[in-house]
Amino acid sequence: MLNNFSMDFFSLKEKIAFVTGGNTGLGEAYVVAFAKAGADLFIVTYDNNWEETKKLVENEVGKAYFYQANLTDREQIRKSVIECVKIYGRIDILVNNAGTIRRAPLLEYKDNEWKDVLDINLNAVYYLSQDVAKIMEKQGSGKIINIASMLSFQGGKFVPAYTASKHAVAGITKSFANELASKNIQVNAIAPGYVKTLNTAPIRADEKRNKEILDRIPANRWAEPFDLMGSIIFLASKASDYVNGHILAVDGGWLIR
């Protein structure tokens, strides 16, 4: 009975997942989770360093197509969506995972740093969601999952562009959901807490800051990328068909303190 329930509500068999930034950190964890759940994958990466991720997917007997693109380029975004449909015929799940961060005090922040972060973290999310939602509307269904942050709720320090972009991601998640829910397209977001990735390595290396973070997390540990696997499958599967515009914090309790 449990196996039937799991298959009915959480299986992604025969689903096509389009994932950006899927060859490292949390993106790689999402990709592996999708492969475990039976989805076929179209993975957009900034570089061609995807051999390790490819092996992880193949270990799950999954099918993955890797596509290199610069997500600051509107035309390359458009072409990536066209290529996915050309290969698979459809897109059932979009995960806007690709992101970047630039750290510097506000008074020293450079214009190009601001633009770089907003282009990847916000503009690419908008363009991809717009392009893919048109396909999902024709299909009659779809899931769009954005990646928010604890800094979708807080101000942060020394990361003004990142904070602005992640507040905006939370906002457009709700805005998109308002328009797309009636088309059977669910738009939601995951807000990861403090996760062990390359982006957070400088913080973890700062003994004082690391202790401050751990002292605030009720779970008393940094998340591992695999801690996010369950949430991404939930939002990508039938189990979340009546969930719209929600920002799901997976944070070990960070926000409740």
Language model features with spans:
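Active-site loop-to-helix junction immediately N-terminal to the catalytic Tyr of the SDR YXXXK motif
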Residues: 109, 155-163, 175, 200
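Conserved glycine-rich cofactor-binding loop
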Residues: 16, 23-24
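Residue(s) in the substrate-gating loop at a strand-loop-helix junction
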Residues: 149
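Short C-terminal tail/terminal secondary-structure segment
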Residues: 2-8, 154, 233, 244-257
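Active-site helix of classical SDR
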Residues: 129, 165, 173
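Short, small/polar-rich loop/turn modules that mediate ligand/substrate recognition or access, typified
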Residues: 181, 186, 243-245
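Substrate-binding pocket helix/loop in short-chain dehydrogenase/reductase
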Residues: 105-106, 113-118, 213
